[in-house]
Amino acid sequence: MQKLHFSMLINAPKDIVWHAMLDDQPYREWTKAFNEGSYYKGSWEKGSTILFLGPDPNTGEEGGMVSRIAENKLYEFISIEHLGIVQNGVEDTTSEVARKWASAFENYMFKDKDGATEVHVDLDVEDEHVEMFNEMWPKGLRKLKELVEK
């Protein structure tokens, strides 16, 4: 497992960037960089289970991640603990594939920089997915910046 880090300076206050990153409609827009049709079910409230979903590019069936919000400090920090996967619409936290994701964290930090916001993303990734996320995350953050600054 490797830890990856990405950041982007966005010319807007933290609350605006926070909502653009986490509210349903803008989330669906900026996460197209990961998977066309991405969305989530659940809440960003601390302790809540949240499902990150979208069509599986190979099967067309619903797939994604089962996760828990480990921490939520409004406009400051979100910590997502991945618990497993969703395959064909079914949650899986026990298979070998699902266990690879268990205890992986994805953290978003929002820092004020003279009225702009520096978004930092830290995530734990299996070696086989490093290249994919190194390509997708910068695209996603650029799309988020574009949405907020337009």
Task: Tell what function each PLM region has.
Residues D56-D114:
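Hydrophobic-ligand binding "helix-grip"
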Residues E36-I50, T59-E61:
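A solvent-exposed, acidic/Ser-Thr-rich amphipathic alpha-helical stretch
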Residues K3-S7, K14, T49, G64, ...:
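Intrinsic-disorder/low-complexity, polar/charged segments enriched in Ser/Thr/Lys/Arg/Asp/Glu/Gln
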Residues I10-I16, S43, A70-S79, M109-E118, ...:
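A short, structured loop/turn motif at beta-sheet edges
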Residues M1-S38:
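Hydrophobic ligand-binding cavity/cleft-lining segments
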Residues R99-A102, D124-K150:
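A conserved amphipathic terminal alpha-helix motif
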Residues A12, V86, V125-D127:
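Beta-strand elements of well-folded, non-transmembrane domains
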Residues V17-M21, Y27, I50, I69, ...:
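Hydrophobic pocket/interface hotspot
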